[in-house]
Amino acid sequence: KAVMLYFANMKIAQAFHPLLSSFEVILRNQLHYALAHHFSDGNWIINQKNGFMVASSLTHTNKRTKKQVTNRYLLTEVQKAEKKISDRGARITAGRVIAEQTLGFWNSFYEVHHYILLSGVPCTIFKKLPSGYGRKQVNDVITQVRELRNRINHNEPICFVNKKCDFSY
């Protein structure tokens, strides 16, 4: 029975792969176009390493430890991508850096701190959001898609709860 559930889960997971891949590519490309327009710079992902990715508003004092904490997630991910590209002996281009980024990277543009720095540009890629739907709701949906994608990629059960098929996840 367990083997049957495993293979059923695998088949369902396989069916999701094209959709999840398309979602990620479309989100990535649309965010790139919107941000390239916003910064009037097709190389924004490289050039903004000295711009919004290091803004002072990304630093705050941790209330518990009283230490300063700086969110350099986007900057760090861009630098990692550049190193990876360089280590392959390839020329660093905006297109290559963009292609190296994960869904988590793109998801982070909908976190409050980055969203504010970008003047709400990330939500402009969704032309027909329902009334009452904004940054938080978009972020929540992208996070859910990312979590589903991660469950699928790590061969975790995506629809079987207590040996029954349950798609409520």
Task: Go through each PLM region and give its residues.
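Amphipathic alpha-helical interface elements
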Residues: 1-169
